[in-house]
Design a protein with these regions (language model features):
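Short, low-hydrophobicity acidic/polar segments
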Residues: 5, 16, 25-126
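Short amphipathic, basic-aromatic surface patches that mediate peripheral association
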Residues: 1-10, 134-142
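Tryptophan-paired
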Residues: 11-71, 142-240, 278-279
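A sequence/structural signal for flexible, mid-protein segments enriched
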Residues: 87-188
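Extracellular beta-sheet/turn segments enriched in Thr/Pro/Gly and aliphatic residues
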Residues: 80-125, 135, 229-279
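Generic structural motif
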Residues: 2, 22, 51-53, 61-63, ...
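Repeat-unit-sized solenoid/scaffold elements
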Residues: 56-62, 128-146, 243-255
């Protein structure tokens, strides 16, 4: 996170450690859960030779929405990627990403016998937390217990892969279809725990090539497109309130329908206190 405080276990409940030799060939993968991280009991189980150089990559929060591809065949970290497993299956929609983090370190094992080597891998966010809320549309049919959400949200041209260098792969983009829930207390549809890969370039600046996302909302029953908006333009308009280049960046979006008019705007809670009502 921004700052010097050690907050590893607050943001990550699982870390996978990929160990490579100095040429970039994979030697093994170790996984460590939140309990091990919290109590500092994670003990790597790799047999490393004294005097040799190694590279490690730490991946945080790789759960159901994360797979690592090419690590067994590629030696260039720029060609090893995190992605949602469904990206490789055209019949399965991608609905989310995990709250991933990435970090890497290169080190040389000491030659001295019986010497313990200790080092630190700093992890950086690979994701942006996204909150989308939709106001002014009819609620689901309350008379039916099995009533489905009648609207489909999507982000076209979404970044599909992030490399072990923690850089977005600009040549791989696709459409993500986040699940919507209906919030009866706040009378709106909204996303829940949605994450997208980052939208800033290698210098940490918002870049149109990294943010080609198009937000689309459709009526599932009729196929009618209700609204379409360019995410990059939205971020430029609201640069004083939203900064997606930060660590732990958040992207709040409100879609508001008023009669025949629809608008993509900042949620009211961003202006008031910066926290959504459901958090």
């Amino acid at each position: 996170a921004d700052g010097d405080k050690d907050v590893l276990y607050q943001y990550m409940s699982k870390v996978d450690l990929y160990v490579f030799d100095e040429s970039g060939h994979i030697l093994g993968v170790g996984s460590y859960n939140q309990d091990e991280l919290t109590k500092f009991e994670a003990v790597p189980s790799f047999k490393l030779q004294p005097g040799r150089r190694y590279k490690v990559v730490a991946v945080g929060n790789a759960y159901d929405h994360t797979e690592v591809v090419n690590y067994a065949t590629e030696t260039d970290f720029a060609n090893i990627y995190l992605q949602n497993p469904a990206w490789s299956d055209p019949d399965v929609p991608v609905t989310n990403h995990d709250y991933n983090y990435l970090g890497q370190k290169e080190f040389v094992m000491p030659n001295q016998e019986g010497v313990m080597y200790r080092d630190t891998v700093t992890l950086y966010s690979s994701h942006i937390k996204v909150d989308v809320e939709i106001h002014g549309l009819p609620a689901p049919d309350a008379s039916r217990q099995d009533a489905e959400i009648p609207y489909q949200l999507s982000f076209e041209n979404s970044n599909a892969q992030t490399s072990f260098e923690n850089e977005v792969n600009l040549s791989e983009k696709g459409t993500i279809y986040p699940d919507l829930i209906y919030d009866s207390e706040n009378q709106c549809y909204r996303t829940q725990d949605l994450a997208l890969f980052r939208m800033d370039d290698t210098t940490g600046e918002l870049n149109a090539d990294y943010c080609e996302h198009i937000l689309v909302l459709k009526n599932k029953n009729t196929g009618q497109e209700l609204i379409r908006g360019n995410l990059y333009n939205y971020l430029l308009r609201n640069a004083d309130a939203i900064d997606v280049t930060k660590q732990e960046a958040e992207l709040p979006i409100a879609i508001e329908f008023n009669g025949v008019n629809a608008e993509i705007k900042l949620p009211d809670w961003v202006i008031v206190d910066g926290k959504p009502e459901w958090n």
